[in-house]
UniProtKB/Swiss-Prot annotation:
One of its GO terms (cellular component) is nucleolus. It comes from Sclerotinia sclerotiorum (strain ATCC 18683 / 1980 / Ss-1). The lineage of its organism: Eukaryota, Fungi, Dikarya, Ascomycota, Pezizomycotina. Gene3D superfamilies: 1.10.287.4070, Nop domain. The keyword Ribonucleoprotein applies. Its main location: nucleus. The gene is NOP58. Belongs to the NOP5/NOP56 family. Keywords: Nucleus, Ribonucleoprotein, Ribosome biogenesis, rRNA processing. This is Nucleolar protein 58. It is found in: Nucleus, Nucleolus.
Length: 570
């Protein structure tokens, strides 16, 4: 009968048991392994390979959890190469598939419900199955290994790595604000003592280092500043110190200024270190996004979204306006045009575009960034688990970002009709390079110019020649005449316009009266026609009764006519 081997991992090492294959065909396996005597009768210890240290135990167990075959496990399984038609019971089906791919092994991995019952019994009665292993030692080693394994999982969690980028970019922004404030305070404070140095040295770090090395202004000529400044700058500072117009300060003032200068130097060095750290982390976590928009813009996008996965789930339209939420909601509320870009506006490709092309390039860049983000967040770059080789190199990981950036640059070059600037060059809003002020700028100190004075000594001041006044004719009378004429003309024109308005109103009233008279004449003609018709009808009727009735109707008609006339008069 073919044997059955059972592979078990413990906190102390890897264990290989041997049993009869009929064990899997029994229906009451769980009841037989409930006691230590029963499980010892079914299983025999084949081999026990201990872990050398806690680090080795963590490495081996971590590989088993991920379903990988470690070198130590491969060495243990080499002892079973001579076994024919044997089976190997494992707890993880993924691990069984990895073992089945090993060359030279004819074992058949098994993982089902019955093997789970066997592993449960082994864990319960492990001290009785392995001689020399105490229960206290097993519990202590299991506790330490579980803590180490938990730390290992948290350390390599991609969600936790995003936190490093979010905190780093936030700290970088805070450092920039603090450095700007401290550097301005140092220049204003030390400027009372040596104001000319602020115009010569523009770099904040060099300014603070000069203060720490020189101290009082009188020590400038005897201090060597070659390790901080170039020769021409050093010479300019020493020349300006000799004729400086600054006030004197005490040693206590200088001590406080030096303490602040030390803060500027320390923060500047830490800021450089943090910037390099952020660039390295962005290249490792989101290489395609970094190639498209840069380290700082990419880090701000991740920080604004909360994590790399949240940003990868966002569509391109959201990535395009991320950071401009206030402007978006204000535009929707007022029914105006929505913004075209948010944080992505600071990318170099968008900065090189001009006018309406900025919106087009921002839309293209957001679309490519959305694809690159999904590749960065969801791709499994490591191929070791599949047995295909080592990790993918950085160039292959960022290949999508490089090709996408080249496509956008080609499109931008076509619509702009000009060559693009190389990467790393600061670009202003107009698409041109922003010429930052140089670190070293030589400016001559201003000296007193005696030639500019009007008097060289005690010479009396020259009298200013008085110019003769020319008699000019008065033009007041002419102005008055012209004013009166113009006023008379304006009055006459106003009177004429008023007369014309009155005549027009009179003509309108006469026309209205004529219309009313015509209407009255038409009504009178209609009445006369009606009366003539009534007279004809009365002449036709000859009977007295009819004449009497007709008479009454005529009297009634006369009364009605009188009433109508009264109404018309009223």
């Amino acid at each position: 009968m073919a044997p059955l081997f059972i592979l078990t991992e413990t906190a102390a090492g890897l264990v290989l048991f041997k049993a009869d294959k009929k064990l899997l065909k029994k229906d009451d396996v769980a009841s037989e392994i409930e006691t230590a005597e029963g499980i010892n009768g079914l299983l025999k210890l084949k081999q026990f390979q201990k872990f050398d240290s806690a680090a080795t135990a963590l490495e081996e167990v971590a590989s088993l959890v991920e379903g990988k075959v470690s070198p130590m496990l491969a060495k243990l399984l080499d002892t079973l190469k001579d076994e024919k038609k044997a089976s190997l019971a494992v707890a993880d089906p993924k691990l069984g598939q990895a073992i089945n791919k090993l060359p030279g092994l004819t074992l058949t991995p098994i993982s089902d419900s019955k093997t789970n019952d066997i592993f449960r019994g082994i864990r319960d009665h492990l001290p009785s199955l392995i001689p020399g292993l105490l229960p206290e030692h097993i519990s202590t080693m299991s506790l330490g290994l579980s803590h180490s394994l938990s730390r290992h999982k948290l350390k390599f969690s991609p969600d936790k790595v995003d936190t490093m980028i979010v905190q780093a970019i936030s700290l970088l922004d805070d450092l920039d604000k603090e450095l700007n404030t401290y550097a301005m305070r140092v220049k204003e404070w030390y400027g009372w003592h040596f104001p000319e140095m602020g115009k010569i040295v523009n770099d904040n770090l060099a300014y603070a280092r000069v203060i720490l090395k020189v101290g009082m202004r009188v020590n400038t000529s005897s201090t060597d500043l070659a390790d901080i400044l170039p020769e021409e700058i050093e010479a300019a500072i020493k020349a300006a110190a000799e004729v400086s117009m600054g006030t004197e300060i005490t040693e206590e003032d200088l001590d406080n200024i030096k303490l602040l200068a030390e803060q500027v130097v320390g923060f500047t060095e830490y800021r450089q270190q943090l910037s390099s750290y952020l660039s390295a982390r962005m290249q490792a976590i989101a290489p395609n996004l970094t190639e498209l928009v840069g380290e700082l813009v990419g880090a701000r996008l991740i920080a604004h979204a909360g994590s790399l996965m949240n940003l990868a789930k966002s569509p391109a339209s959201t990535i395009q306006i991320l950071g401009a939420e206030k402007a978006l909601f204000r535009a929707l509320k007022t029914k105006h045009d929505t913004p075209k870009y948010g944080l992505i506006y600071h990318a170099s490709l968008v900065g090189q575009a001009t006018g309406k092309n900025k919106g087009k390039i921002a839309r293209m860049l957001a679309a490519k960034a959305a694809i690159g983000l999904r590749v960065d967040a969801l791709s499994d770059w490591s191929a070791q688990g599949e047995g295909k080789g080592d990790d993918v190199d950085d160039e292959e990981r960022s290949a999508l970002g490089v090709t996408s950036r080249a496509k956008i640059e080609r499109h931008l070059r076509g619509i702009e009709g000009k060559p693009l600037l190389p990467r790393g060059v600061a670009v202003g809003p107009n698409g041109k390079t922003t010429s930052a002020p140089g670190k070293w700028e030589v400016k001559e100190a201003r000296k007193y110019n005696a030639d500019a004075d009007g008097l060289a000594g005690d010479e009396p001041a020259a009298a200013i020649p008085v110019r003769e006044k020319k008699n000019k004719k008065l033009i007041e009378e002419v102005a008055e005449k012209s004013d009166s004429d113009s006023s008379d003309e304006s009055d006459a024109s106003e009177k004429k316009s008023k007369k014309g308005d009155k005549e027009a109103k009179k003509a309108e009233k006469a026309a209205k009266k004529a219309e009313k008279a015509a209407k009255k004449a038409a009504k009178a003609a209609k009445k006369a026609v009606k009366e003539a018709k009534e007279v004809k009808k009365s002449a036709v009727n000859d009977t007295p009764e009819v004449n009497g009735k007709k008479r009454k109707s005529e009297d009634d008609g006369e009364k009605s006519e009188k009433k109508k006339k009264k109404k018309n008069k009223d």
